[in-house]
A protein has these predicted regions:
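NAD(P)+-binding Rossmann beta1-loop-alpha1 motif at the extreme N-terminus of oxidoreductases
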Residues: 1-51, 67
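Internal alpha-helical scaffold of NAD(P)-dependent oxidoreductase catalytic cores
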Residues: 140-171
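A short helix-to-beta-strand connector/capping loop
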Residues: 50-58, 118-121
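Short acidic low-complexity segments
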Residues: 55-69
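Residues at the C-termini of beta-strands that transition into short coil/loop
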Residues: 32-34, 63, 103, 126, ...
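Rossmann-like NAD(P)(H) cofactor-binding subdomain of soluble oxidoreductases
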Residues: 74-75, 79-137
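Short, charged/polar "capping" segments at the starts of alpha-helices
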Residues: 36-41, 107-111, 162
Length: 171
């Protein structure tokens, strides 16, 4: 079981929680400023009406509660928020935790290097993997469209196939 932390309660965080959490090989957790508004039983619905049902294990606003337990930390925040967010999780990241960004085109790698240094294993998508919106905040999301393909950049990841396989499965 791979432990994933979805960081952020916006559109990408909502959709990712449902889609990734619906896969039985992934245990999903959410780090958000509004944990009291999230439910442990969550779903994302795509354009054809397919439901991705997920159980969110830990929902918190405290990075210390979840970041040390995760194999992959997926940052679903707008680019301007990356530096301050990375400052809040810095002390809890393990050297073996993979840090990912869904908004890579907004300077994700630069923010990682500025805050965490040059040795952090990280990856970032060039563009967001899909479009959508929360239906009921913290409970459900509507997936409105998929990207036909994804481009990903990686830094300090010796087993890149692991990340490629993760992205193929979840997106």
């Amino acid at each position: 079981m791979v432990n994933v932390c979805i960081c952020g309660g916006g559109s990408q965080g909502h959709i990712s929680a449902g889609v990734i959490g619906s896969n039985p090989n992934y245990n999903v957790n959410v780090l958000t400023r509004r944990p009291e508004q999230w439910a442990h039983d969550f779903k994302s619905i795509d354009l054809e009406g397919k439901e991705y049902r997920a159980h969110i294990d830990i929902i918190t606003d405290n990075a210390a509660d979840i970041i040390p337990k995760c194999d992959i930390v997926l940052v679903c925040l707008p680019g301007y928020a990356n530096v301050s967010f990375l400052e809040t999780i810095k002390e809890y990241l393990s050297p073996t935790t993979y840090l990912g960004g869904v908004f890579g085109g907004s300077g994700f790698f630069l923010a990682v290097q500025k805050v965490l240094g040059h040795n952090v294993p990280c990856f970032a998508l060039q563009r967001v993997p899909f479009t959508g919106r929360p239906l009921e905040y913290g409970h459900s999301a509507r997936l409105k469209g998929y990207k036909p393909y994804l481009k990903v950049g990686m830094m300090n990841i010796p087993d890149s196939e692991r990340i490629v396989n993760f992205l193929k499965v979840v997106y």
